[in-house]
């Protein structure tokens, strides 16, 4: 009972349960990662027992934790999942794979640095602080390998089958590698007894510093001459409206200042990453139909989307006054 009511276990279950309504991919990722952490903790808790009994206790309690956390996480997510319809169809074997040189261009440095860290831990013996680093490394390596083996089938199946799986998993891998490197490079550099390992660490660190220069290129590519005050853009995402759509900018300010509640804003529907749906985006008010592809991705079915898109278009283009009034009554 004490193992199930541990505050850390309860908080962990609730927090990963939140991933159901923020990003379900992260629920799977951190459920597995957290499970590995729980197994390690249980190994430490029962390390004084004899080996056969220690293994049984560790795996038994870990399995109990796994079931309990999964149950609590799903209970925490019930207010969302009871009304949610997933767009995922199934998991399939990957038919396309990354080209080796492209794969290693992106992941070679963090993978080599991680393996070097594992080597150090194995040869010198693991310190208590190494456990989290090892957990991050194993998880990150697994996340960059999985999309080369399987992927989740969704609306991108025909043209970009692995794109969503690759993005969701490797994004988390990138984050884990970044956290790991902050610890691993210092851990490796402080090792004084192994000259070869220190040389390899220096090479990895030099490559890492070289990669940091990309930041300068990226900033200039996105924002131009940042040192020129005349080209300052700032962090205000609505600023472009003042020059591109000044009338809309004024309307958005008025809505933000005067409208209360959640009335529906009717806007023409368009593609993702465009100027469509700008009023609902900048005010937070609901609209009849958001960016088409995003709405499709969240639902996996275009039937209702096409119907709504046609109705919105009819409201703006129809010459039949009665039809427009009827559609407005339904939509807004």
Where in this protein do the model-derived segments appear?
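Alpha-helical transmembrane segments at the extracellular/periplasmic loop-to-helix junctions
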Residues: 1, 70-74, 78, 94-124, ...
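Membrane-interface helix-loop-helix junctions at transmembrane boundaries of multi-pass membrane enzymes
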Residues: 2-6, 46-59, 119-138, 192-199
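Transmembrane alpha-helix segments characteristic
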Residues: 6-12, 127-156, 202-212
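Signature aromatic-anchored transmembrane alpha helix within multi-pass, membrane-resident enzymes
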Residues: 9, 59-74, 188-219
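Membrane-interface alpha helices of multi-pass inner-membrane proteins
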Residues: 10-22
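Perimembrane helix-loop-helix junctions
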Residues: 30-70, 90-95, 113-124
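Membrane-helix boundary/interfacial segments in multi-pass membrane proteins
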Residues: 83-105, 146-176, 229-231
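Extracytoplasmic
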Residues: 216-332
């Amino acid at each position: 009972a004490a193992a199930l009511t541990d505050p850390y276990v309860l908080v962990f279950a609730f927090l990963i349960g939140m991933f159901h309504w923020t990003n379900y991919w992260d629920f799977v990722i951190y459920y597995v990662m957290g499970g590995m952490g729980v197994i390690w903790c249980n190994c430490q808790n029962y390390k004084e027992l004899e080996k056969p009994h220690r293994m049984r206790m560790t795996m038994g309690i870990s399995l109990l934790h796994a079931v309990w956390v999964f149950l609590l996480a799903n209970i925490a997510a019930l207010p969302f999942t009871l009304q949610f319809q997933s767009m995922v169809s199934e998991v399939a074997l990957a038919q396309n794979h990354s080209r080796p040189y492209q794969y290693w261009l992106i992941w070679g440095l963090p993978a080599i640095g991680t393996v070097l860290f594992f080597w150090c831990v194995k040869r010198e013996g693991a310190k208590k602080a190494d456990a989290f680093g090892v957990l991050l490394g194993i998880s990150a390596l697994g996340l960059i390998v999985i999309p080369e083996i399987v992927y989740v089938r969704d609306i991108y199946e025909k043209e970009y089958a692995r794109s969503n799986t690759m993005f969701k998993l490797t994004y988390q891998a990138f984050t884990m590698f970044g956290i790991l490197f902050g610890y691993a490079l210092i851990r490796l550099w402080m090792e004084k007894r192994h000259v070869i390992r220190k040389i390899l660490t220096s090479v990895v660190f030099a490559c890492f510093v070289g990669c940091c220069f990309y930041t300068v290129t990226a900033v200039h590519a996105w924002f131009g001459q940042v040192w020129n005050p005349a080209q300052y853009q700032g962090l205000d995402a609505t600023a472009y409206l003042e020059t591109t759509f000044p009338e809309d900018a004024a309307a958005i300010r008025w809505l933000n200042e005067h409208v209360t509640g959640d009335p529906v804003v009717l806007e023409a529907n368009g593609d993702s990453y465009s100027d469509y749906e700008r009023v609902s985006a900048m005010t937070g008010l609901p609209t009849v139909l958001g960016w088409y592809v995003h709405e499709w991705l969240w639902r996996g079915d275009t039937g209702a989307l096409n119907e709504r898109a046609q109705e919105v278009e009819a409201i703006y283009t129809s010459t039949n006054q009665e039809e427009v009034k009827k559609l407005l009554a339904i939509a807004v």
